[in-house]
């Protein structure tokens, strides 16, 4: 069992170089701790803490109204997840966001969620509440102690958010609504998770999650960078020519300014800086992605996932239900962050049935590629 130090969460501290709230200075002056030690505590990067220092931190939290005496020191520690589903289930507040489309009738108040996104959302709920179907295996036959009878991790609050898919409202309104959802999540207190379902083609909150994760501008294309290695993200969705093409840090029509031959699909950068296309684009092959960033010291998780097509999204839902272990552990762990980024390639068996569009139990061979630590580190550690 592993624990994280949640000082940043109790203080509501977000390490943003553009904002300097004076948190570290205030703690240093009150406790007498070293500035670098406080910074490391806020990032959950300290392996041990003296009892005297822990006592002074508790005094600081009580005096400044961040916690009560009966909550400390326990509130400063949290059990860390040991698999993909625990990563979500251990959050106290879980928010899931999907993109919606309007009815063609301008007077209608009806809006639609893509069937594939609904299937993926349902699988997420199932996995979180049953720990991927393993919850019954973890319950003790007889509760011989209070510890043994401890309840399984599960969110205390579930929330759903709806945003306009690109093209379903004025561009400014699409961005405004997505930013509002993300800001409300960021401003909420306590341990929390936000999951954006779909790609940037259908869910603009996914764009915001990815842009904030890699410190670049949302809703701005990177197709004109000099070389592919200058892209802010280590993976790229090349739109179909007949797709909507909303400006995106993750997606576009070419890897770089000089690129002329990029084919539709998902690409990622390998450990050596080479860009690899996933799948051949042939009939019967589908591709999807999963990304998450966990700031353990803040108790904050942001995640997004989706397929290149509706079928790919439904296949991803099935993969989560049967192979969630392939999305753990995160490939990158540094600077108080854990990041997992994965591309999933599906190969369907030969033959197609007309009812495939309604099936949620599609069978396909799945190959999960982990986007390597080096590709992520090159972008985060040069900031």
Describe the role of every protein-language-model region:
Residues 45-46, 64, 79:
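The DNA-recognition helices of helix-turn-helix-type DNA-binding domains
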Residues 9, 40, 59:
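DNA-binding alpha-helical recognition surfaces that contact promoter or target DNA
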Residues 21, 48-51:
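Residue at a beta-strand N-cap/secondary-structure junction
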């Amino acid at each position: 069992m592993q624990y994280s130090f949640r000082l940043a969460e109790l203080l509501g501290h977000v390490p943003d170089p553009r904002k300097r709230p004076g948190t570290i200075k205030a703690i240093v002056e009150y406790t007498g701790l070293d500035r670098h030690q406080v910074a490391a505590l806020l990032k959950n990067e300290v392996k041990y803490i003296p009892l005297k220092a822990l006592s002074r931190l508790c005094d600081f939290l009580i005096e400044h109204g961040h916690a009560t005496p009966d909550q400390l020191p326990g509130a400063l520690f949290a059990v860390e997840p040991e698999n993909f589903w625990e990563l979500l289930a251990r959050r106290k507040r879980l928010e899931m966001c999907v993109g919606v489309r309007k009815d063609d009738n301008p007077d209608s108040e009806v809006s639609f969620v893509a069937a594939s996104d609904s299937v993926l959302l349902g699988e997420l709920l199932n996995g979180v509440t049953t720990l991927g179907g393993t919850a019954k295996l973890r319950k003790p036959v007889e509760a011989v102690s209070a510890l043994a009878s401890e309840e399984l991790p599960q969110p205390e609050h579930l929330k759903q958010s709806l945003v306009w898919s690109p093209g379903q409202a004025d561009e400014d309104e699409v961005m405004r609504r997505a930013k509002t959802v993300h800001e409300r999540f960021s401003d909420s207190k306590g341990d929390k998770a936000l999951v954006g379902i779909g790609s940037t083609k259908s869910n603009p909150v996914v764009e915001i999650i990815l842009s904030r994760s890699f410190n670049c501008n949302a809703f701005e294309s990177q197709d004109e960078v000099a070389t592919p290695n200058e892209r802010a993200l280590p993976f790229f969705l090349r739109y179909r020519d007949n797709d909507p093409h909303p400006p995106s840090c993750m997606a576009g029509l070419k890897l770089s300014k000089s690129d002329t031959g990029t084919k539709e699909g998902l690409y990622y950068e390998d450990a050596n800086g080479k860009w690899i296309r996933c799948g051949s684009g042939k009939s019967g092959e589908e591709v999807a992605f999963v990304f998450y960033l966990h700031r353990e010291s803040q108790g904050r998780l942001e995640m997004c996932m989706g397929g290149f097509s509706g079928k790919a999204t439904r296949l991803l839902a099935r993969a989560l239900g049967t192979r969630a272990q392939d999305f753990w552990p995160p490939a990158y762990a540094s600077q108080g962050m854990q990041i997992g980024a994965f591309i999933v390639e599906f190969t369907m068996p030969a033959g197609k049935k007309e009812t495939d569009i309604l099936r949620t139990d599609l069978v396909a061979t799945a190959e999960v590629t982990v986007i390597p630590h080096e590709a992520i580190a090159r972008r985060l550690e040069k900031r």
